[in-house]
Every structure is written in structure tokens, then in C-alpha cells.
From Swiss-Prot:
GO function terms (MF aspect): phosphatase regulator activity
Domain of life per record: Eukaryota
Segments for region (Disordered): 278-343
Keyword Flavoprotein attached: no
Subunit structure: Associates with PP2A-alpha catalytic subunit.
Cysteines joined through disulfide linkages: none
Function description: Associated to surface IgM-receptor; may be involved in signal transduction. May be involved in regulation of the catalytic activity of type 2A-related serine/threonine phosphatases.
Tissue: Expressed selectively in brain and testis.
A GO BP entry: signal transduction
Protein name: Immunoglobulin-binding protein 1b
Compositionally skewed regions (Basic and acidic residues) per UniProt: 317-333
UniProt lineage: Eukaryota, Metazoa, Chordata, Craniata, Vertebrata
């Protein structure tokens, strides 16, 4: 009884798929950045629900490899979209350090979806990896690489244009069928057409996303290789020490004209002094006193004494005359003796 109650409480496969699709539509219609926390939480929740739906689908074993899409029930066609939905949600996960791994996981989901829909003949398209392998194995196609690239680019451009037009037509038809199918008023034929158009729409999206993923993976790998190369170049390497170099012209010039200054020192001062002591006899103490000049004395000689006395007398006479002149000016004011206003 308890197991039956638990089974009844478990979400159904249809509910898991519809909730996952609803969360994906909310993420795509949101105005917030994809890397924001609310958006990332919705992406992870949707992936979790779709993973549960995939596990339940594998246990139910609804599809067979030998079937065609016409043999699948109309209500079961929508479950073929599970790998494509997981691939679209994986691309919306944010993580710069894990970006390469996320791209590889998303590519694997899209490849599983395309392989499954191609085997059921849901739409007429060619698998991208099968097309590239056939071109590589054709020797005639590889004879002229430049011409092959031009033809491939033109064909790829035309395919993208055609795919875009088909996608717009499918989306327009889906918008007209969506309300009737979701409300349960559509008959089995319209329900079948609606889910078949949904599968073809996701086929077009998956083909475009795989091309974009391949380009981004190539860019990331080139960036990583450049980073490793720059890191190896920047790592310090042991190098032999640089040897001094001598210009031949400078050596020849020095041999002819010398080193460029008066002389080069050939011995130290101590060596010169020792050599001088060996060649000459050092004078004795008495001879050194005789050769020494007489010491200067700062005492006043007898000849200079009269000169000093005479200079002092002259200074006293000059001072006496100046005093007499000052006294005369005091007794004789300015203009004294000029009685006739002369001068």
C-alpha cells in the first residue's frame, strides 16, 4: 500500500516534460542576464526535471530503432524532444572555467536528438558529421582545396537560408495550433501535426547550435594552446652567462696610441716606496735636522720695536690735532669772518 502511494506521489513523465519546457520558455523570455542567480536556478531545475524524464523514458522503452515516426503514438512524439531540450538548457549554464565541458555536453545532447530523429525519418536532413566524413573520404573533392572551400561555403549559406525560411514557416504554423492543443480541443491529427512541427523546429535549432558549438570549441582550444605557449615562453630558462666582447678596432688603436690617458699604474705606492728605500740610503737623524729649514718665530725682533713706538707717536699726534680742530669749530661757527657776504 505504501509503495502504491509513493508511486502516485511521483510526478508523471508528461508533467516533468511540460514543466521543463515551461522553465525553458521562461528563461528565454526573461529580461535578466543569463548569468544571474534566478535564471541559473531555473536552468538547473529544468535540467534536473528533464533528466528524471529521460530516466523514466528509458525505463518505459517507448521507442524502437526499427520504427518510423508514423508508427509512434501522437501523444508520445513530444518525448523525442528531450535530448534537444537538455542541449539548449546546457548551453545556458554559466561557468567560464567549465565552458568547454558544457559545450561538449550540449553537443552530445543535440547529436543524440538528431541521430534519433534521423533514424525515425522525422525530417529530410543530413547529419553534419556524416557530411564532413564523406567530404574527407572523397579524393576528388580534396584535389582542389580552394575550390572545395568555396563550394562548401556557398552550399552552407544556401542551406542556412533555406533552413531559416522553413523554421519561420514552422513557427507560424505552431502558433496557430498551440492554443488548441494545450487546451485539449484539438483532434488527434492536429496534435500529431503540432508535435511533428515541434520536432522539425528543434532539428533546425540543433543543426545551427552544433555549428556554433564547433566554432566556439575551436576558439577555446586555440586560446588554451596560446596560453600554454605563452606560459612556456615566459618560464625562466637557464642560459649561459654572457661573455665580454672586445672591439678589434679598439684593441688595435690601444696598441698604437696607448690607452688614451698619460700612463697606466704599474705598481702601488707601497711598492714604489720600498723600491726607493732599496735604491737610496735614508738620511740619519742629524743630517735630517741640518737639512730641515729653520723654524719660524713669531716674536717681535729688536729692529721692529722703534717702528712700533714711532707709529704710536704719530697716532697720538693725529688724535691731538683732530681734537684741536673740533675745539676751533666750536668757537668759530660757520661763516665766521665773512663780513662782506663774499664767497
Amino acid at each position: 500500500m505504501a509503495s502504491f502511494t509513493e508511486e502516485m506521489q511521483k510526478p508523471k513523465l508528461r508533467e516533468l516534460l511540460e514543466t521543463g519546457i515551461q522553465l525553458l520558455e521562461e528563461v528565454e523570455a526573461a529580461t535578466q542576464p543569463t548569468g544571474s542567480k534566478p535564471i541559473q536556478e531555473k536552468v538547473r531545475e529544468a535540467l534536473k526535471l528533464l533528466e528524471k524524464a529521460s530516466d523514466m523514458l528509458s525505463q518505459l522503452d517507448l521507442f524502437s530503432r526499427n520504427e518510423d515516426w508514423e508508427e509512434i503514438a501522437s501523444a508520445d512524439l513530444k518525448y523525442l524532444m528531450l535530448p534537444a531540450l537538455k542541449g539548449a538548457l546546457t548551453l545556458k549554464l554559466v561557468g567560464s572555467s567549465k565552458r568547454l565541458g558544457l559545450l561538449q555536453d550540449a553537443r552530445e545532447h543535440f547529436m543524440n536528438f538528431l541521430t534519433q530523429t534521423h533514424s525515425y525519418h522525422v525530417a529530410d536532413f543530413q547529419l553534419p558529421w556524416a557530411q564532413s566524413s564523406s567530404m574527407e573520404g572523397n579524393p576528388a573533392a580534396t584535389s582542389d582545396a580552394q575550390e572545395q572551400n568555396l563550394v562548401a561555403m556557398a552550399s552552407q549559406r544556401q542551406t542556412k537560408i533555406q533552413r531559416y525560411k522553413q523554421k519561420k514557416a514552422v513557427e507560424q504554423r505552431l502558433s496557430s495550433l498551440k492554443s488548441a492543443v494545450e487546451s485539449g480541443q484539438a483532434d488527434d491529427e492536429r496534435v500529431r501535426e503540432y508535435y511533428l512541427l515541434q520536432l522539425r523546429r528543434w532539428i533546425s535549432i540543433s543543426l545551427d547550435e552544433i555549428e556554433n558549438i564547433e566554432q566556439e570549441i575551436e576558439i577555446l582550444r586555440e586560446r588554451d594552446s596560446l596560453g600554454e605557449t605563452s606560459a612556456s615562453r615566459s618560464s625562466p630558462q637557464e642560459r649561459p652567462p654572457l661573455k665580454p666582447f672586445v672591439l678589434t678596432r679598439s684593441v688595435a688603436q690601444a696598441q698604437v696610441f696607448g690607452a688614451g690617458y698619460p700612463s697606466l699604474a704599474t705598481m702601488t705606492v707601497n711598492d714604489w716606496y720600498e723600491q726607493r728605500q732599496k735604491n737610496e740610503v735614508s738620511p740619519t737623524l742629524q743630517e735630517a735636522e741640518k737639512q730641515a729649514p729653520p723654524s719660524e718665530t713669531f716674536t717681535v725682533s729688536e729692529k721692529e720695536e722703534p717702528d712700533l713706538e714711532q707709529k704710536e707717536d704719530e697716532d697720538e699726534n693725529a688724535l691731538h690735532r683732530m681734537q684741536e680742530w673740533d675745539d676751533w669749530k666750536d668757537t668759530h661757527p660757520r661763516g665766521y669772518g665773512n663780513r662782506q657776504n663774499m664767497g
